Design a protein with these regions (language model features):
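Active-site nucleotide/adenylate-binding loops and adjacent lid/helix of ATP-dependent enzymes
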Residues: 1-10, 73, 112-197
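ATP-binding N-terminal substructure of ATP-dependent carboxylate-amine bond-forming enzymes
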Residues: 1-110, 114-116, 120, 127, ...
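ATP-dependent carboxylate activation and anion-phosphoryl transfer catalytic cores
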Residues: 2-4, 10-13, 33, 245-332
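A short, N-terminal amphipathic alpha-helix
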Residues: 26-37, 176, 180-183, 258
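Hydrophobic beta-strand scaffold residues
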Residues: 38, 103-104, 132, 152, ...
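A glycine- and small-aliphatic-rich helix-loop capping segment at beta-alpha/alpha-beta transitions
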Residues: 95-104, 170, 175, 305-306
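Phosphate-binding site of ATP-dependent enzymes
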Residues: 169-254, 275-282
């Protein structure tokens, strides 16, 4: 049986460039060479695309030297975009792949763009009857008004990994927090603080998505689940499953799958929720390309649910090919 040729996209222009490379290395190490002919395409911080020459070898492939000569990728069966943040998770690369007619893993153009924008995402979920935190959106020049009291959160609308996010405790911290967020985006959210347990759920599938066991996020040595607690070794504990009643765990899983469906996601997502007051589930965010190392939350959640990392990759590639086959029959 011929091997599938898989192109792994890594890097990107966002502040999550290094996180993307770490995820891609794990993918390269885990794709079975007996099944897949893997090539790597790294996108530099300057937007330059470089083709790896190591045939998928981690040591030879990443990072790709900036002075690499132009090269032709050739035909591929499926693209695995392991890109986080703007210019990778926001529908831009997905649009390019759609134009090229190439199968790719993960959400499509519209779902990627929608879920990247925390403001629009919350509005769509709220209109669909799913509970979300209250928020207001600011553009440059808008008056800064916090209607929720303190503490609250200030966030760039379209960035991940908690980059540019501040937990604000009083009026004196609000202005600088908004200024920081505007360094990263042209739209900023002020969001109410939810005093609850933070849980995350993996979702896998196309038209029939399934949820993993949830995992509770417990920051260690940090006031909240910020960038440092996400990526510092020992920055947080992940408790799978959370110490919650079975009915609440099922409610979290249903909310995650419904958020996936409402936003018309495909392939994969990690849905972040809060459980407030022991039983009220609030959807916070949906990540269409979650961190993807073997020790990332998404992979751990499915491993605990009986889907090991290598099998998870295999299923995602199969889902991408299934979607491409389905769409190839459409008449435009």
């Amino acid at each position: 049986m011929a091997r599938l040729r898989v192109a792994v996209l890594a890097g990107g222009r966002s502040s999550e460039h290094d996180i993307s490379l770490a995820s891609a290395r794990s993918v390269l190490e885990s794709l079975d060479p007996a099944e897949y002919d893997v090539v790597t395409v790294a996108i530099g911080r300057d937007g330059r695309w470089e083709l790896g020459s190591g045939g998928g070898s981690v040591a030879e492939t990443l990072p790709i030297p900036a002075a690499s000569a132009p090269a032709t990728l050739g035909a591929v069966d499926v693209v695995l975009p392991i890109l986080h943040g703007p210019f990778g998770e926001d529908g831009t690369v997905q649009g390019l792949l759609e134009l090229a007619g190439v199968a790719y893993v993960g959400a499509g153009v519209a779902a990627s763009a929608l879920c990247m924008d925390k403001d629009l995402f919350k509005k769509v979920l709220r209109d669909s009857g799913l509970p979300v935190a209250r928020h207001v959106a600011l553009r440059v020049g808008d008056a800064i008004d916090n209607p929720f009291g303190y503490p609250c959160f200030v966030k760039p609308a379209r960035l991940g990994s908690s980059v540019g996010i501040s937990k604000v405790h009083d009026d004196g911290e609000l202005g600088p927090a908004v200024e920081l967020a505007f360094r990263h985006d042209e739209k900023v959210l002020i969001e109410e603080f939810l005093d609850g347990i933070e849980v995350e759920v993996g979702v896998l599938g196309n038209f029939e998505p399934v949820a993993s066991l949830p995992g509770q996020i417990v920051p260690l040595g940090h006031e909240w689940y910020d960038f440092a607690s996400k990526y510092d070794e020992g920055g947080m504990d992940l408790v799978i499953p959370p110490d919650l009643p079975a009915a609440v765990i099922e409610q979290v899983q249903r909310a995650a799958v419904e958020a996936f469906r409402v936003t018309e996601c495909e392939g994969m997502a990690r849905v972040d929720c809060f459980v407030v007051g022991g039983s009220r589930v609030v959807v916070n965010e949906l990540n269409t390309i979650p961190g993807f190392t073997a020790t990332s939350v998404y992979a751990k959640l499915f491993d605990a649910s009986g889907v090991p990392y290598e099998e998870l990759l295999r299923r995602l590639i199969a889902l991408a090919l299934e979607r491409q086959e389905r769409r190839s029959k459409l008449q435009y």
